[in-house]
């Protein structure tokens, strides 16, 4: 029945669990062997969708057909379920964030080494089209030397009305969206070390956990990266704003509206000043049209199903994993530094963590 397929057992059939089943329907090398959720109504829902359902976590972990346990539960549950699954002989995919601290992650890594099981994390935003466009621009030096990147996601509805509002479950925007945006930046600049971290958190709609944050990362070589998440923003700033010595790129929204503006090399011998309310300025005057060139953003398309295809290749063929545990640990330690900076209102010298 399962010949040549990698069989997943899914724990957690909430929003992300259902989303995983939709994605996996397009990955023929993987089959969902069954689903377990602690809530009976979720198990009933999964059964009505045609999935096999387990009556307990133990029943799933004792099923010899299951190769991989995919954990899509609240954040605080990831670590204990993953450890039990690996001890039961299962490979593990955890939803992000993998857990709530770097020490917890180290425990999970130790169990993976002890049991010889594959452990990875679903960092799916590496396949976002907007990120892939920015990565292409940076790698191809389309803007020359990039000296500043701004990465933002803004919403206006606060934190979703579930466990993400609660500290005990690992709620808050640093752990929810920050883990994505920080992973993208560290993946983009994988070989460059962070020198300093400064951050602030917001508590506009929630006093228990952060409902937004801003952090500024300074990388070796001087590149500065601003990462920001807001949930009480009724006018959103651009998703990406990238400044290079030879030009600027902007991606305004999820629909990939944006453009690139680069200098042509033509020198303005005489700058016409622009009139402002309180006087003239040449410094802030717009450039002459013949000194710049406007270009469309390149087309780059990602496929999130590639994450699961890679997992199947790792399990079946010993392929290199796309999401590596040292990368996950680096993101986790960076989030801890963000919390530390926000709590102390201090710039963190991050070089001690980048050895």
Residue ranges and their predicted role:
Residues 1-3, 68-70, 296-298, 306, ...:
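C-terminal helix-rich "cap/oligomerization" subdomain common to oxidoreductases
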Residues 1-49, 355:
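N-terminal Rossmann-like dinucleotide-binding module
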Residues 20, 38, 52-111, 304:
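Beta-loop-alpha module in the N-terminal Rossmann-like domain of NAD(P)-dependent dehydrogenases
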Residues 107-124, 144-151:
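Rossmann-fold dehydrogenase core element
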Residues 124, 246-323, 354-355:
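C-terminal glycine/acidic-rich active-site capping loop/insertion
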Residues 125-206, 345:
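Predominantly a Rossmann-like dinucleotide-binding segment in NAD(P)-dependent oxidoreductases
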Residues 228-236:
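Glycine-rich phosphate/pyrophosphate-binding beta-alpha loops
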């Amino acid at each position: 029945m399962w010949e040549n397929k990698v069989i997943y057992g899914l724990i957690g059939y909430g929003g992300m669990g259902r989303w995983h089943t939709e994605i996996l329907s397009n990955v023929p090398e993987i089959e969902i062997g069954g689903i377990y959720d602690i809530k009976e109504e979720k198990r009933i829902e999964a059964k009505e969708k045609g999935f096999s359902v387990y009556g307990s976590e133990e029943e799933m972990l004792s099923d010899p057909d299951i190769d991989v346990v995919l954990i899509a539960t609240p954040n605080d549950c990831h670590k204990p379920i993953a450890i039990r699954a690996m001890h039961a002989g299962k490979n593990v995919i955890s939803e992000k964030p993998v857990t709530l601290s770097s020490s917890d992650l180290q425990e999970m890594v130790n169990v993976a080494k002890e049991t010889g099981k594959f452990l990875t994390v679903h960092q799916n935003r590496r396949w976002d089209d907007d990120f892939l466009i920015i990565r292409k621009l940076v790698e191809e030096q389309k803007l020359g030397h990039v000296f500043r990147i701004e990465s933002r996601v803004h919403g206006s509805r606060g934190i979703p009305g579930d466990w993400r509002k609660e500290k005990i479950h690992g709620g808050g925007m640093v752990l929810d969206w920050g883990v994505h945006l920080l992973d993208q930046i560290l993946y983009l600049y994988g070989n460059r070390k962070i020198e300093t971290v400064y951050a602030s958190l917001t508590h506009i709609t929630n006093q228990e956990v952060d409902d937004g944050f801003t952090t500024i990362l300074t990388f070796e070589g001087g590149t500065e990266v601003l990462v920001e998440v807001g949930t009480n923003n009724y006018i959103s700033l651009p998703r990406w704003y990238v400044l290079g010595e030879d030009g600027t790129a902007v991606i305004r929204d999820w629909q990939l509206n944006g453009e690139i503006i680069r200098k042509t090399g033509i020198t303005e011998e005489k700058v016409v000043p622009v009139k402002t309310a309180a006087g003239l300025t040449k410094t802030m005057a717009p450039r002459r049209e013949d000194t710049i060139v406007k270009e469309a953003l390149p087309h780059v398309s990602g496929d999130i199903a590639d994450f699961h295809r890679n997992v199947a290749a790792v399990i079946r063929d010993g392929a290199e994993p796309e999401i590596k545990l040292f990368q996950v640990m680096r993101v986790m330690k960076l989030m801890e530094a963000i919390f530390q900076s926000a709590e102390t209102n201090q710039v963190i010298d991050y070089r001690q963590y980048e050895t």
